[in-house]
Amino acid sequence: MFEKFKIRKQIKVIRQRISFLEQKRARSQAALVDAILRKVDPADEDVEYFNRFTGEIDRLRTEMHELENQLLKDKKTGKV
C-alpha cells in the first residue's frame, strides 16, 4: 500500500515538472517560429534550449509511463 502511494506521488511530481518544462520550452519554441516566419536563422541559444527541454520532457514522460505501467501491473497481480 505504501509503495503504491509512493509511486503515485512520484507520478504527480513528474507531471508537475513536465508542465513547468513545457512552459519554458514554449518560450524557445515561440522564438524559433518567429525566426522561421521572418525567414532568418534562429539563434543557436533558442535551438539549444528547445532541444534540451524537449529531451528532458521526453525522458520524464518515459519515466512516468514506466511508473504508470508498474501501477497497472501491480494492480492486475494484486500486488501492492
Each language-model region and where it sits:
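Short, charge/polar-rich alpha-helical segments
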Residues: 1-23, 55
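Charged, amphipathic alpha-helical oligomerization/scaffolding segments
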Residues: 20, 24-27, 52, 56-59, ...
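Short E/K-rich amphipathic alpha-helical oligomerization segments
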Residues: 24-51
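Long amphipathic alpha-helical coiled-coil segments
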Residues: 64-80
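Solvent-exposed, non-transmembrane amphipathic alpha-helical segments
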Residues: 38, 52-56, 77
